UniProtKB/Swiss-Prot annotation:
GO terms for molecular function: cysteine-type deubiquitinase activity. This is Ubiquitin carboxyl-terminal hydrolase usp-48. Residues 403-415, 532-543 have a biased composition (Basic and acidic residues). The keyword Ligase does not apply. The gene is usp-48.
Length: 1264
């Protein structure tokens, strides 16, 4: 029996549909019965409407017109206009992309092919130093240079690689380039992430060591040192006058920023006096009078400042997130303070680059730069290949101090990101001449290869992109025009058709589904194009594009796909060959869903290469309206290759090995190679249905509701044929019928002639019924209001002859009962009610010579795919668990399809009647409430008297009525039973009150002894705790059922006690309560008295006492007792949708370890996760939930029962929580999950892994 909580809430009726139906009913009610003809039915169904002008206007909003059954506008066709507009914009964008990058306004980025953001950051900063770029351009290779042996750096190859990178960045027409891979190989950089500032320092040191070994390297090294190398002087001064100085070369400044918030404050601390308390003067031999100070003696043109953003603590190295305010211009005296023997050429230094380390700690992050262009003086954000202008320059306009920053913090002004994460600052000396000179490019012989490669790649890609966009736009416009023409032919109205059989009905959802799937297929290419691919996919795609572009540049004629089977002069031939190859590889029946089919279709379209635009016009003349063309490929199959001979491109055709089929035979190309677009759409369509009336014909209700559309017959049948729809009728009793195709009907479909006239007449009867019922309902309400005058109890006076009694309950439910009776009568005559199903039939393609059949990728409609495993999808993804075998349901479906191949559609009904559907209707008998179980008049029901005329109005709605005359007497047996019950209840209430007074003290003594757990020496017997609870809750209102002393819940099947006394584990279960002999006799005597008073015929049964000696239960059944204890213990671990608490503990934090199993509220709440689980869930499912919260992979999680206790490793993943004995709501003793940190593997190519700054380049060329 269904619980009330499981019942579905009653659905509210659609008021719009009710209004349409009531409008039709009112029209029929106002019509005489002899005038209800077929013409009137057509009028009521609104099939006499003219063309709908309300929705003929263009609108981007979809809406189903329910006022006019002929209106098929705005079902989804309007979305195609937007798609064409987007494709036209894409075409224009492709033409714009043919324009070269503005070399003066848009910098080019560097693609990050691995964990090389630190290399890109270094290169992009120093590329924007014109002096350094010119220095690289001026380097010349030498034939006399002998490359050193590994691991020493090949300085010539390195300088030429830098030259190639800088030249490409300066001249490439693309917005990004990938030129860092060659430099990484020369420097033997691994895939680990490194520190950007350390890389720059190591790189310049390596150049200093290796350039002197090159014939042309000494001049380059001198210019390099003059650019960024300065000289500092460290002075140690004593108060006695002793003074010592030491000069050294300085490449960069490393500032400690802990405790400082501005760059000037950090510089003051760096260049300020430092007192050496432990230093002893060699002259005066005194300690504590010595000071140390550093200062610049010679300032370089470019000053590099590195901000030390990490510190060492007891917890390891931590990143400093201190905001650092730095100025856009800084005076030279901030660096050169005391020694002015060599004054700087300029008084100011301007900020031109900021290196930013983005990340939460010192072990992980990502580098990017903010750089000022030396050409246009604009600021840009260089984030690998993404380069964008920033509206506001970084830094502060003027130098600030700590005092200024304190007022800023007081005003609660937020710090910008560049100040919170700046890691390196670069300042350039402000010289007298501006702008800076544009670097002169290297000689032509050094850059000719790169120049040619860039030009060929740009011309090939842009031309290919434009032609592909033009073809896609043409195909899209052609397909959309075809859909518009098809739907235009479908539209009809009263002026266009002459006979009713010229109008057919199609489900509105079918028309919408066709348009929706046409739209999805049409936008498939664009959607896939805009979808953001992963980094590995992008890299692969770039390699393929480069290879294809090189082939295009080698020959202007080689614009077709290299995989095409034979050269052709039309785009259709090229597309057909590509499509055939893709389809041949996927001919094996594969249980993929419709979404996978759509993705495959989109990928097929992407593989198709582009043909010249002039061929599209030739193709347009040969195309038909209903499908894309198919091309027969002649034998033998030839494969086209290009070969360069004497500077000219030659085409060589060689016979390709025939593709082998799945059964080992060679396949042929006799079948068409191009799949029509309509077949692709059919693979995505769902099932649709039209409800049939109870007479097996077309009901008028779907027409009124707008659920079906009236369309022209011939175009409708053509539409169903194009998308391969099949129909069947499924009756409510489970019978399936495949109707025969009638004359001139390729597909069975309802026409206007099939409108059921019986249902139309029933609608008229329904209107009359409702009107009459409304009048009689007023009569019923009047009878109920006159209850005092009509009730047999409130007005016991004698009634006139012929008056009858009606149950008050029957009158209260009169309207509902009347409508149910009518529905039952209709249901008995409506034995053919069901639905007409439209299902897109699976397509079959048969190879002529291969000897096997292939199925389409489309799944059976209405049957969703079942999961290949009971493990959740997320678990399959994480642990790569899953089966590649086909589900049994899929195999069964395909076997059934294969058996029916080649046979015609069944024309006879399939005997599949469901016996459960043939349930007899319940008969409704009006006023049956007054019939008692003895066959007389029920004494317990309220009865209201009605006149014979009123009774005639009431009984007309029912086939069966129970007449009760007012003169008839009620059932004597029912009357006597009521009297006895009343008298017995009063006596029992009094006895209960007296008994409670007598046993009150005894009951309190028993309860107090049970709570204190005292072992009384006088305890002789045991009684069930359930009886004590019932006795305590007994009141005078429950007098009719006094509790009995039943010991069954304490006795096992061996009639021995198996439950013990009260303890912590069984406080919710029944247990033994100890009683003295006097207490036992008191309870037994009082209950006997109540039982005897309640029923004189009752037979007294002595309860079975449970003897107790010396506080122990006698004759305890040990076997059953052990089983009961085991069952009680297991009950703790059986739960449904309860919380499992898991605490995340970091072993590096002593506080976490101390509070891992803490009892304090704050200790428990820290890093505590509550996860809803059931005892039947597996441990893997719990770990998957923890993965969502902690991002630790399930198989890597260190999960323990307690801190230092049992570990739940991988071997326990498939065990349930019940098997592992995990109790719910364990917030006092949660599971322990150890926090972990993972470092990236060598194969990872993202920038989100761990980074360890300044850990060196030991294994690279920079260290030798």
């Amino acid at each position: 029996m269904t619980k009330e909580t499981d019942k579905k809430p009653k659905e509210r009726p659609n008021q719009r549909k009710v209004a349409f139906r009531n409008e039709a009913i009112n029209a029929l009610v106002n019509t005489d019965e002899d005038q209800v003809t077929f013409s009137k039915a057509m009028e009521v169904a609104k099939l006499d409407c003219q063309k709908c002008l309300l929705h003929d206007m263009h609108s981007s909003k979809s809406s189903n017109c329910r006022d006019n059954p002929f209106c098929i506008h705005r079902l989804g066709l309007e979305k195609f206009e937007k798609l064409i507009t987007q494709e036209q914009e894409t075409k224009e964008e492709a033409k714009k992309d043919q324009k070269r990058r503005d070399l003066n306004d848009q910098p080019a980025g560097l693609i990050n092919g691995g964990n090389f953001c630190y290399v890109n950051s270094f290169l992009q900063v120093w590329f924007n130093v014109p002096e350094f770029r010119q220095l690289i351009y001026d380097f010349r290779p030498s034939e006399n240079f002998v490359p050193p042996e590994a691991p020493r750096m090949n300085v010539q190859a390195t300088m030429l690689a830098l030259q190639d990178i800088f030249y490409t960045l300066q001249t490439t027409p693309f917005n990004e380039t990938d030129k860092t891979s060659n430099l990484g190989k020369l420097l033997r950089l691994n895939s680990e992430q490194q520190d950007s500032q350390e890389f720059g320092l190591k790189f310049f040191n390596a150049l200093e060591r290796c350039l002197p070994d090159h014939p042309n390297g000494k001049e380059t090294l001198k210019r390099l040192k003059d650019l960024f190398t300065g000289e500092t002087c460290t002075r140690i001064v004593c108060k006695c006058g002793q003074r010592s100085e030491r000069e050294e070369t300085a490449i960069s400044l490393t500032l400690n920023i802990e405790g400082y918030c501005t760059l000037l404050d950090a510089l003051d601390a760096y260049f300020g006096e430092e007192h050496l308390d432990d230093f002893k003067c060699s002259k005066c031999n005194k300690t504590g009078d010595v000071s140390k100070q550093s200062d610049y003696v010679k300032l370089p043109p470019v000053i590099v400042i590195q901000l030390n953003r990490y510190k060492y603590t007891s917890k390891g190295r931590q990143k400093l997130k201190t905001p650092m305010a730095y100025p856009r211009e800084i005076p030279a005296k901030a660096f050169q303070r005391t020694n002015n023997s060599i004054p700087p050429p300029a008084e100011m230094y301007d900020l031109f680059a900021v290196t930013i380390h983005e990340g939460n700690n010192a072990e992980c992050g990502h580098y990017y730069d903010l750089i000022k262009s030396p050409l246009n003086q604009k600021w840009y954000r260089y984030n690998d290949e993404a380069i964008e202008a920033i509206p506001k320059p970084p830094g502060t306009e003027k130098p600030t101090t700590a005092k200024t920053e304190k007022s800023r913090k007081k005003d609660k002004e937020k710090y910008p990101t560049d100040q919170k994460a700046c890691y390196g600052l670069l300042y350039r000396r402000r010289d007298a001449f501006k702008p800076l000179p544009h670097p002169k490019l290297p000689p032509e012989e050094l850059i000719i290869d790169s120049k040619t490669e860039i030009e060929e790649l740009f011309e090939g890609l842009t031309k290919k992109k434009i032609e592909k966009s033009e073809k896609r736009l043409y195909d899209l416009e052609r397909r959309i025009n075809k859909v518009k023409i098809s739907y235009g032919k479908l539209e009809t109205h009263s002026d266009k058709y002459k006979e009713a059989n010229e109008v057919v009905f199609l489900p509105t959802t079918l028309l919408q589904d066709v348009l929706a799937q046409e739209y999805e297929v049409a936008k498939g290419e664009k959607k896939k194009k805009k979808k953001e691919a992963s980094e590995n996919e992008e890299k692969k795609k770039n390699e393929e594009d480069e290879a294809l572009s090189a082939a295009i540049a080698a020959s202007e004629a080689d614009q077709r796909d290299k995989a095409s089977s034979e050269p052709s002069t039309s785009a259709a031939a090229t597309e057909a060959g590509d499509d055939e190859e893709l389809r041949a590889e996927s001919e094996t029946p594969n249980p993929e869903n419709a979404e996978s089919t759509q993705v495959a279709i989109m990928e097929t379209d992407e593989i198709m290469d582009t043909t010249p635009t002039k061929d599209i016009d030739i193709l347009a003349k040969a195309m038909e309206d209903n499908a894309l063309p198919t091309v027969e490929v002649p034998q033998p199959e030839l494969k086209k290759r290009t070969r360069q001979q004497n500077g000219e491109v030659k085409y060589v055709y060689s016979q390709r090995t025939p593709r082998k089929s799945h059964n080992g035979t060679n396949g042929t190309n006799s079948s068409p190679q191009k799949q029509p677009v309509s077949s692709r759409v059919a693979a995505l369509l769902s099932s649709h249905e039209i409800p049939t009336c109870g007479h097996g014909k077309m009901s008028i209700d779907p027409i009124l509701y707008g659920d079906v559309k009236a369309v022209s017959r011939a175009p409708a049948i053509a539409l169903l044929r194009e998308y391969d729809f099949r129909v069947k009728i499924v009756y409510d009793n489970g019978e399936n019928v495949f109707p025969e195709n009638e004359k001139e009907r390729d597909v069975f479909i309802f026409t206007a002639e099939d409108i059921c006239m019986e249902c139309v007449r029933e609608m008229r009867e329904e209107g009359n019924f409702n009107n009459q019922l409304e009048d009689d309902e007023k009569l019923v309400r009047r009878i109920l209001k006159e209850e005092k005058q009509r009730c047999s109890v409130k007005c016991p006076s004698e009634r006139p002859d012929g008056y009858l009694y009606v149950a008050k309950f029957a009158l209260s439910n009169f309207k509902k009962s009347a409508m149910s009776a009518r529905e039952n009568r209709l249901a008995q005559s409506h034995n053919k009610q069901g639905t007409l199903h439209f299902d897109s039939h699976p397509m079959f393609q048969q190879k002529s010579n291969s000897g096997y059949l292939t199925l389409s990728l489309k799944r059976t409609r209405g049957k969703p795919r079942k999961s290949l495993s009971e493990i959740p999808e997320k678990m399959q993804k994480l642990d790569e668990i899953g089966s590649k075998e086909l589900p049994d349901e899929i195999i069964a479906d395909e076997e059934e399809i294969s058996e029916n191949m080649g046979s015609d559609i069944p024309t006879k009904p399939v005997e599949s009647i469901n016996p459960d559907a043939l349930v007899p209707f319940e008969k409704i008998e009006f006023n049956s409430e007054l019939r008692c179980s003895h066959g007389g008049i029920n004494f317990n029901q309220f009865r209201l008297s009605v006149s014979p005329e009123e009774w005639a109005h009431l009984k007309v709605y029912f086939d069966e009525c129970y007449e009760v005359k007012c003169s008839d007497d009620v059932c004597d047996q029912c009357r006597q039973m009521e009297v006895d019950a009343q008298n017995g209840s009063e006596n029992m209430r009094g006895l209960v009150r007296e008994m409670r007074k007598r046993i009150s003290d005894t009951l309190k003594t028993v309860e107090s002894r049970a709570e204190s757990k005292e072992d009384g020496a006088d305890i002789k017997y045991g009684i069930c705790s359930v009886f004590i609870d019932k006795l305590r809750k007994l009141t005078s209102r429950q007098s009719t059922s006094p509790p009995s002393i039943c010991q069954e819940c304490l006795l096992c099947p061996h009639q021995q006690p198996f439950k013990g006394f009260l303890n912590e584990d069984n406080h919710k279960d029944s247990h033994v309560v100890g009683l003295t002999e006097e207490e036992w006799n008191t309870f037994l005597t009082e209950i006997r008295k109540l039982e005897e008073a309640g029923d004189d015929q009752s037979i007294a049964v002595d309860p079975c006492p449970i003897p107790i000696e010396n506080g122990q239960i006698v004759d305890m059944c040990e076997k059953c007792f052990e089983q009961h204890i085991k069952f009680t213990e297991e009950q703790k671990y059986m739960f449904e949708n309860e919380n499992i608490y898991v605490k995340l503990v970091n072993l590096n934090v002593e506080e976490d370890i101390a509070k891992a199993n803490g009892k304090a509220r704050r200790g428990r709440a820290k890093n505590l996760y509550a996860i809803k689980m059931s005892s039947t869930n597996k441990l893997m499912e719990l770990k998957v939930q923890l993965y969502d919260k902690t991002h630790q992979l399930p198989n890597d999680q260190l999960l323990y029962r307690t801190a230092g206790g049992e570990q739940f490793d991988v071997s326990n993943n498939q065990k349930t929580l019940f098997d592992l004995r995990l109790s719910p709501n364990n917030n006092d003793n949660p599971l322990i999950l150890i926090a972990q940190q993972f470092s990236p593997s060598a194969s990872q190519a993202d920038e989100t892994g761990d980074r360890a700054p300044e850990r060196g380049f030991v294994d690279t060329a920079l260290a030798h």
